[in-house]
Design a protein with these regions (language model features):
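Residue-level signature of mid-helix packing/kink "hotspots" within the transmembrane helices
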Residues: 77-85, 174-175, 284-288, 292, ...
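Juxtamembrane intracellular "pre-TM" segments in multi-pass secondary transporters
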Residues: 15-31, 213-245
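Cytoplasmic helix-loop-helix junction between adjacent transmembrane helices
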Residues: 130-168
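Cytoplasmic membrane-interface "Motif A"-like loop-to-helix N-cap segments
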Residues: 93-104, 300-313
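A late C-terminal transmembrane helix in Major Facilitator Superfamily
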Residues: 364-393
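Helix-to-loop junctions at the C-terminal end of transmembrane segments
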Residues: 84-96, 185, 291-303, 391
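C-terminal ends and interior cores of transmembrane alpha-helices
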Residues: 105-121, 313-329
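Helix-loop boundary and gating motifs at the non-cytosolic
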Residues: 28-77, 242-247, 251-269
Length: 426
């Protein structure tokens, strides 16, 4: 398999060639040269996160307390954050293809003990370790491909290109995964549903790493200590990068909190887990269109302004709507759907961050992308951690208020994230 790890010519990031963006698909932000990569990300994410919408309710039914569940997911999130950060700087050490192959290996190495030993024995310490190892697979795989996109697509379509990435990511994690697992759970049970993820992951790796013949151009001449030191120093030297990490962390806290809170909160109002999974999948169909809409809008009016005006504002209002829709309307799937749809639209408005943040440091995109990915990964930790801290003293309602306030803050924190003078998408 040595040929699969060849990264092509060893050029510096600033000297790389980008695609000549021609044809209707390229103008839509989906260059055909990367099409198999997008398909691979969708399949890999579907398999690697197939349990995320129902794992909390499954563990609760096995007698685990809410605090134990959220702690396990917080540990998982910390590992995801660390690996997400490394996926940006690791390209200069190992190369993008090699990182994605390592991610595939981690998935299988972590999944086997989690499914066959930890879950059947209800072994909590082993569950934490094996689930964390399984969990690092999807950010390492997906965010390495996000680096690939940022490297190979020119600025005028970058907002749309990264929106396609988040569409592939979101369709796998929040639409196909929940719908497919909802059907599988009722027919073959939890363990076999988890095992079905193996097929999706294998197919995803095949599409993104074998059928995808594009060669990322990235210098692999750094030592790991040098690359990690550079990634840390960017956060020390650049205040904008620190702000960007905070905003990107807030981006997905609702998504990773809601999948813990809603399976516990909604049954009080007569909702079943199957209803929750169906509604959650449906509203994320809306997110597909919102992702592309705001990617296009960001390319037109500016990435920063799109995030400032629409992202945190809509997500904050939606968090409050999700809290009070069941209180006001009871067991009303329509009311819950409308509230969650507002959240899905707001989430799409965060999409231009994936074009904005790397462009804040055009001379060091690798380190900037590592900051972007760190924020993405920290969402996995921050969402469950907020639940751990807040749900006992404040309840579900108070926790949703905390999430709403953080979203409102994210819009304000984006205001200073102005591009350098040579930036084109302010």
């Amino acid at each position: 398999l040595g040929f699969l790890f060849d990264e092509g010519s060893q050029q510096d990031m600033t000297e790389q060639s980008v695609f000549i963006q021609q044809g209707i698909w390229a103008r839509l932000g989906l260059p055909r040269e990367l099409s198999w990569g997008f398909i691979g990300v969708f399949l890999f994410i579907t398999g690697a996160t197939i349990e995320q919408s129902w794992l909390a309710s499954m563990l609760q039914s096995r007698g685990f307390a809410e605090v134990e569940i959220s702690l396990m997911l917080s540990v998982f999130g910390l590992c995801v954050a660390a690996v997400s950060w490394f996926s940006g700087i690791g390209a200069g050490v190992l190369g993008l293809r090699r990182l994605m192959w390592i991610a595939t290996l981690c998935y299988f190495v972590g999944s086997v003990p989690f499914i066959f030993v930890a879950l059947p024995m209800n072994n909590y310490p082993m569950m934490i370790v094996s689930y964390a190892l399984r969990g690092v697979a999807y950010p390492l795989f997906a965010y390495s491909f996000l680096v690939w996109i940022n490297q190979r697509c020119e600025a005028r379509i970058l907002g749309r290109a990264v929106s396609w990435f988040w569409i592939a990511f979101g369709v796998g994690m929040t639409i196909v995964g929940p719908w497919f697992s909802g059907w599988m759970l009722s027919h073959v049970g939890e363990s076999n549903t988890l095992l079905s993820g193996f097929l999706f992951v294998a197919l995803g790796a095949f599409c993104a790493l074998i059928l995808n013949r594009d060669e990322p151009v990235w210098a692999r001449n750094q030592k790991i200590s040098q690359a990690m030191g550079e990634g840390i120093m960017v956060l020390v030297r650049e205040p904008k990068m620190r702000l960007a990490v905070v905003v990107k962390t807030i981006n997905d806290i609702g998504k990773f909190s809601l999948v813990i809170l809603m399976p516990v909160y909604l049954p009080r109002f007569g909702f079943s887990i199957a209803e929750w999974l169906t509604i959650w999948g449906l509203v994320n169909v809306v997110n597909i269109f919102a992702n592309y809409l705001f990617g296009w809008l960001g390319d037109k009016i500016g990435w920063r302004m799109t995030v400032v005006w629409f992202s945190g504002t809509l997500c904050g209002l939606a968090s409050l709507a999700v809290c009070y829709a069941p209180v006001m309307f009871g067991h009303s799937p329509a009311a819950l759907f409308i509230a969650l749809t507002l959240y899905a639209v707001g989430l799409g408005a965060f999409g231009p961050l994936s074009a904005l943040i790397p462009s804040l440091l055009p001379e060091n995109k690798g380190a900037a992308i590592s900051c972007l990915n760190l924020g993405s990964g920290l969402s996995n930790f921050a969402g469950p951690f907020i639940v751990t801290l807040c749900v006992a003293p404040l309840g579900v309602e108070g926790t949703l208020w905390v999430i709403a306030l953080l979203y409102f803050a994210a819009s304000l924190l984006t205001v200073p994230l102005k591009l350098p003078d040579n930036g084109t998408k302010e």
